């Protein structure tokens, strides 16, 4: 794997960086860059939103979170990762793919997962939540079992 010069910080991979729902990923990139931290922003399309991320000084990579090769390429050389993704029918598949790649990569200091507040009120047999909320709960379970250094955020 690529390594930066001794004493320099490894990039932080931010997924969902160009997302428009809540703009959380974009905000994470902006805050990290304001602190002069190296950021690799993963986006689905190279468009004006990707250009805006580049303007912050972030490195931008284009990829699909459901493709292990794309995730592995984006993660290569990174030390930490922020996983966020908008509401999507592919959320569960993407999260499992990202978790599997991150576990195989084996060099993350932190894996920050943007979950949902409602997850704290759920359990194995609850039934009142939406499909997306259930998927977030399942992802938290899998990440907990993964052995990754996970931080769950439930805004």
PLM features: what roles do these ranges have?
Residues 54-79:
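Conserved Rossmann-fold cofactor-binding substructure of NAD(P)-dependent oxidoreductases
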Residues 37-44, 83:
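Conserved glycine-rich Rossmann-like NAD(P)H-binding loop of the short-chain dehydrogenase/reductase
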Residues 39-40, 60, 150:
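Hydrophobic anchor at the start of a short beta-strand
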Residues 11, 79-80, 110:
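Structural motif
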Residues 3-37:
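N-terminal Rossmann NAD(P)H-binding glycine-rich loop of SDR-like oxidoreductase domains
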Residues 16-17, 63, 85, 115:
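Glycine-rich, N-terminal phosphate-binding loop of Rossmann-like dinucleotide-binding domains
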Residues 18, 42-47, 63-65:
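N-terminal Rossmann-fold cofactor-binding loop
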Residues 84-155:
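Glycine-/Pro-rich loop/turn segments that contact NAD(P) or position catalytic residues
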């Amino acid at each position: 794997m690529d390594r930066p010069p001794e004493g320099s910080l490894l990039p932080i991979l931010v997924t969902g960086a160009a997302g428009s729902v809540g703009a959380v990923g974009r905000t994470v990139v902006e805050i990290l860059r304001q602190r002069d931290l190296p950021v690799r922003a993963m986006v689905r399309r190279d468009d004006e939103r990707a250009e805006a991320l580049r303007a912050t000084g972030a490195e931008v990579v284009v990829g699909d979170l459901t493709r292990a090769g794309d995730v592995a390429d984006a993660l290569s050389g990174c030390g930490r990762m922020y996983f966020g993704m908008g509401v999507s029918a592919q959320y569960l598949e993407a999260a499992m793919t990202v978790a599997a790649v991150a576990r195989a990569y084996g060099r993350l200091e932190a894996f920050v997962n943007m979950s949902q507040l409602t997850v704290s009120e759920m359990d194995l047999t609850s039934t009142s939540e939406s499909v997306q909320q259930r998927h977030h709960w399942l992802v938290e379970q899998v990440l907990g079992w993964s052995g990754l250094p996970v931080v769950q955020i439930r805004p």
